């Protein structure tokens, strides 16, 4: 992956769009996929800047409101591993259409929620829709692009998802400030419905392969037999817990500790999203290095310390935001590296491996949001910082002490050059 920088340069110049169009995926379709993953990321993390308003409206604590974010990750994690085999059997188009529709209906239903319980139910529905989209989009790209061109398109889509954090989540914070917590749900749900219409009109129908069965058990056995795959999943889940903990409780921490309102958190949330974009780029570079595991272990360990520092540092508000920005850069580096390792271990079962990887992401999200809320109720934001620190240290330990010594990763070192 020594050409990582060139790939990103080509994406910015639009070459990848032309290449995709020549292989049967038009530029509008690729941009539509990018808009969908942008919306997925924004919807996934949209509760962060709304936690205080939700707690006030439903008469609960911020810690209890944080469980609404965890609910999304629960159904997302359960659904994610099923998506790959199902889309392989029934086609990408129906899975994408159902996923976008469920996302839209879940978000609109959240805006109309009349109680904490009803909002919990609609967030569960939203999670099912979210789980169906990114893995299926990646599979659709792989169906139509050769390996040498697939990476460019995947890089473009992955970047778009983090723009959902840099721009989408701050926009949600501003909408919440302007019109209350329901307005962001209505706007986001309406945009999701518009995406569904465009997807329905533009995405060509596929054909199901007759006689092909889903065969979930055997597909999972292929991955489950490899201990190395479990190391990757554990490292990813623990690092994801630190990332989601930071993203979920950043706005609430700044509102409660520094007297900010939702509008003032928007620039800070944008900085966290930009930090994640930078971290992902750095991770893509490290993924192709011979000593990627050593680098990742050191960066993961540092990310835990910086994230923990954010929740305890007593300094000027924008100094604290700068620390959060640094934390978002560091905590995001591992995702491209672990994704690369996961795919290299999967052989011919990459769809199933991708679903399991997505599940590990969501499991980490549940820990970051739900356990973060529990820690908040027990020990305040200092305890949330401690949770993020412990999660990152666990991830670094798995990478540095276990994965570095595993023969499967040493055997793959030739791919790093």
Task: Please provide the spans of the model-predicted regions.
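Juxtamembrane intracellular "pre-TM" segments in multi-pass secondary transporters
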Residues: 14-23, 203-233
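Helix-breaking motifs and short loop linkers at transmembrane-helix boundaries and internal kinks
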Residues: 59, 91, 112-118, 259, ...
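Conserved MFS/SLC helix-loop-helix module at the cytosolic interface between two early adjacent transmembrane helices
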Residues: 78-114
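Cytoplasmic helix-loop-helix junction between adjacent transmembrane helices
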Residues: 122-163
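Helix-loop-helix hairpin linking two adjacent transmembrane segments in secondary transporters
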Residues: 147, 155-203, 249
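C-terminal transmembrane helical hairpin of 12-TM major facilitator-type secondary transporters
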Residues: 293-338
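Helix-to-loop junctions at the C-terminal end of transmembrane segments
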Residues: 80-91, 279-291, 376
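Cytoplasmic membrane-interface "Motif A"-like loop-to-helix N-cap segments
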Residues: 89-98, 288-300
């Amino acid at each position: 992956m020594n050409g990582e920088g060139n790939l990103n340069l080509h994406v910015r110049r639009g070459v990848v769009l032309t290449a995709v169009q020549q292989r049967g995926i038009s530029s509008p379709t690729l941009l539509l996929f990018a808009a969908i993953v942008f919306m997925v990321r924004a919807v996934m993390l949209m509760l962060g800047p709304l936690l205080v308003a939700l707690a006030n409206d439903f008469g609960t604590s911020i810690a209890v409101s944080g469980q609404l974010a965890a609910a999304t990750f629960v159904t997302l994690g359960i659904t994610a591993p099923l998506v790959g085999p199902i889309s392989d059997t029934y086609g990408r188009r129906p899975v994408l259409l159902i996923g976008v529709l469920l996302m839209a209906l879940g978000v609109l239903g959240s805006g109309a929620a009349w109680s904490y319980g009803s909002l919990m139910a609609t967030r569960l529905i939203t999670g099912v829709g979210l789980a169906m989209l990114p893995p299926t989009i990646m599979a659709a790209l792989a169906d139509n692009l050769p390996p040498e061109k697939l990476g460019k398109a995947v890089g473009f889509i992955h970047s778009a998802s983090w723009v959902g954090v840099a721009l989408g989540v701050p926009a949600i914070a501003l909408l919440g400030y302007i019109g209350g917590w329901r307005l962001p749900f209505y706007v986001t749900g309406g945009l999701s419905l518009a995406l569904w219409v465009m997807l329905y009109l533009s995405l060509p129908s596929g054909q199901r392969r007759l006689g092909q069965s889903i065969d979930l058990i055997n597909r999972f056995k292929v991955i489950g037999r490899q201990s190395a795959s479990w190391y990757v999943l554990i490292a990813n889940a623990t690092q994801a817990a630190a990332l989601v903990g930071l993203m979920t409780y950043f706005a609430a921490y700044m509102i409660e500790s520094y007297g900010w309102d939702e509008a003032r958190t928007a620039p800070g949330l944008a900085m966290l999203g930009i930090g994640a974009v930078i971290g992902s780029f750095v991770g893509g570079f490290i993924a192709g290095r011979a000593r990627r595991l050593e680098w990742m272990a050191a960066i993961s360990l540092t990310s835990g310390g910086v994230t923990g520092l954010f929740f305890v540092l007593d300094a000027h508000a924008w100094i604290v935001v700068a620390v959060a920005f640094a934390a978002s850069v560091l905590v995001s580096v591992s995702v491209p590296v672990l994704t690369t390792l996961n795919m290299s271990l999967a052989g011919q079962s990459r769809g199933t491996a991708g679903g399991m990887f997505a599940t590990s992401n969501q499991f980490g999200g549940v820990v970051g949001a739900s356990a973060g809320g529990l820690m908040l109720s027990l020990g305040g934001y200092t305890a949330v910082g401690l949770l993020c620190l412990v999660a990152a240290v666990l991830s670094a330990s798995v990478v540095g002490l276990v994965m570095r010594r595993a023969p499967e990763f040493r055997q793959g070192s030739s791919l790093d050059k």
